[in-house]
Regions:
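N-terminal secretory signal peptides
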Residues: 1-14
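Aromatic-Pro/Gly-enriched surface loop or interdomain linker
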Residues: 12, 38-101, 295-312
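N-terminal export leaders
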Residues: 14-23, 29-31
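Catalytic beta-strand/loop cores that center a nucleophilic Ser/Cys/Thr
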Residues: 41, 168, 172, 176-252
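Extracellular ligand-binding/catalytic regions of CAZymes and related secreted enzymes
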Residues: 42-43, 70, 80, 233-243, ...
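Structural recognition of the beta-strand scaffold that forms the well-ordered cores
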Residues: 47-50, 86-87, 104-109, 141-145, ...
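Solvent-exposed loop/turn segments at secondary-structure junctions
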Residues: 52-55, 91-94, 111-114, 142, ...
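A glycine-rich, often tryptophan-bearing local segment used as a flexible ligand/cofactor-contacting loop or short
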Residues: 112-201
Length: 313
């Protein structure tokens, strides 16, 4: 680890507190002991970044110096399955030198992260954003949960699809973009890639209660893993055909994985979600191989259909 990165990590996390947080047995995690995707591999290092330059979700909100619920869960998963996690909200960590110390970057973020708004934590610089995208294209893994698609929005109207060349470079990388969401509700995830890591034991799909994002601007090369089943869902945001909710894609040499799940705190300890997440992590860091050909036209052929724009009352 570089001296620059090491000193920053020491500044961000008090080691005595880290030992307490990393032993968070009181979380009641629904760990999947049969999911062994990290054995016989070098210990991977993941940067979990959760700055909010906009709405801050309760699952990533810290209480003083105490780590957030999602941070604790990811750290505990790492401890159990054999990967290291550095959790921060400090955008100054994004430099070319610092990113060399990680195998993957995990975003649970909102807004324009170069702006010092929202949670008031130090923002990423413009150069830091460039360094992030360069690192991914050069081979670093990237993972995004929930509001990672509500980050660095593309210019243009909310209820219109933007051409690829007009999408923000970050949106081009992650492969989709948030429009809006309806009320929290139980909804069905349909498995579109049964052989993707972490998905094998989920059968044809599962149901889970969460806040569900309506998404647009899908990359044409998405390998769709889970599909949002919209039939029966409450809210005009879901008056559209089924669309991708979890996917994988390559960005240059980098492996990109995203799931729209993760708003609710109880989702983070749900065994199905953890199975999906661990499979995505293992693939993104290169521990496991998986065929990820584009399949969006088969898995969700009408995904680009935008829901109706709400009428003003």
């Amino acid at each position: 680890m570089s001296q620059d990165l090491s000193s920053l990590i020491n500044h961000l996390i008090d080691r005595r507190q880290a030992l307490h947080w990393m032993g968070a047995g009181s979380l009641g995690l629904a760990l999947n002991s049969n999911l062994d995707l990290f054995a016989k591999n070098p210990t991977r290092k993941i940067l979990f970044f959760s700055k909010s330059s906009g709405y801050e979700h309760s699952s990533i909100r810290r209480n003083g110096a105490e780590l957030s619920h999602a941070e604790k869960v990811v750290i505990e998963l790492g401890k159990t399955h054999g990967f290291d996690v550095v959790a921060t909200k400090d955008g100054t960590i994004f430099t070319r030198q610092n990113l060399k110390g990680f195998d993957a970057i995990f975003f649970f973020t909102t807004g324009d992260l170069t702006q010092a708004i929202g949670d008031k934590n130090p923002p990423m610089t413009i150069e830091g954003k460039v360094a992030l995208l360069e690192a991914i294209r050069s081979g670093k893994g990237f993972l995004g949960s929930h509001s990672a698609t509500d980050t660095f929005h593309s210019p243009g109207l909310e209820f219109e699809t933007q051409p690829i060349e007009r999408r923000d470079p970050y949106i081009q990388m992650i492969g989709g973009e948030f429009i809006r969401h309806g009320p929290q509700q139980e909804a069905a995830m349909r498995v579109a890639s049964p052989h993707f890591p972490g998905i094998e034991k989920l059968g044809t799909g599962f149901k889970i209660k969460d806040e569900w994002y309506s998404l647009k601007n899908f990359a044409p090369d998405l390998h769709v893993v889970l599909v949002q089943v919209t039939q029966g869902m409450e809210g005009t945001d879901y008056r559209r055909p089924d669309y991708p909710a979890t996917w994988a894609r390559k960005d240059g040499k980098g492996r990109v994985f995203y799931t729209s799940m993760g708003h609710r705190e109880d989702v983070w300890t749900n065994p199905d979600f953890q199975s999906v997440l661990l499979g995505g992590i293992a693939w993104a860091v290169g521990n496991v191989k998986a065929a990820t050909p584009p399949n969006i036209s088969e898995a969700a052929p009408k995904a680009e259909t935008i829901p109706p724009k709400p009428t003003k009352t």
